């Protein structure tokens, strides 16, 4: 099969050569460079194609799409040709973190990766936005085919869009081992039911090829995250106006009410609809906390997951017990999630006032959460011994608010 003709500056020869099936050959028909063709060899054969005097005129070999070539007819047209850049073509690029590195003539500088959302996968894209909330993607694992991040590994999401995982595709594992993990693909892979397509790299794919395990890359997204949660109603007015989004207040509509929910919830849907309803609550319902994730990875994960902080900006907990005489407030365990809460950061001879504690597997009632309003050197706020008490964080604002809550009340929490 021949494609052409175009004019070239090549010189023809009159030698006969043996060609294999799927060789791609440059031919100068009629021994003239005025009629230069590309020939696809469909079978092994011997012929004179007046090829240039180099490698029998063979410039490539077909490795994919052979069936498409066999289907082509004389009346078909090829309207566009684009290169597919493989990782091996850029793997030797220089990856530097030293900002004093001198650039030379001809150097190209790539500083971030831009990812465009798949608008049919709003939940998966929001999951990704939570992973990169500090603007970076940390590489927990890398292979020839992809890089991966484990920040929200274990957080289950429903199946959304299943497509071929092309080079530059960003996916979320929705089931099986590694559920909640996010991947960015360096090479093409087939689509599988366990991977939702979050979006695609639109700029900076060169960084994807050079980044190594335990390094970070800066990420920008289209659209950027849209969230009013934890803002006041007044601040949300200003924020949304700048984005060209219509704002409707709900719940407590006062200017200083704190937003704890928004509808639509997901960035992709808000960007599409250009309108947003926000639910406000009194500032008195709010508590700010600091969590010790490095010292209590399992317990902090548990707390964030059951409160909603794992994939949201504001979490909430329902008060199970509020014992004013003992200066204690407690929140009930979620048994399904509490399995495996091993002892981590234990109290040092006493539990300090306002420390957030979770009961661990050294006791029967695993996963209960408690806070004392005053120091205690005997028991944790869940009533357990110190050996069964993990200190996972502390309250940093809203102390009086917390004291006022009663059994059945909802406490809204935000990390500082």
Which residues are covered by each model-predicted region?
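Cyclophilin-like peptidyl-prolyl cis-trans isomerases
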Residues: 1-416
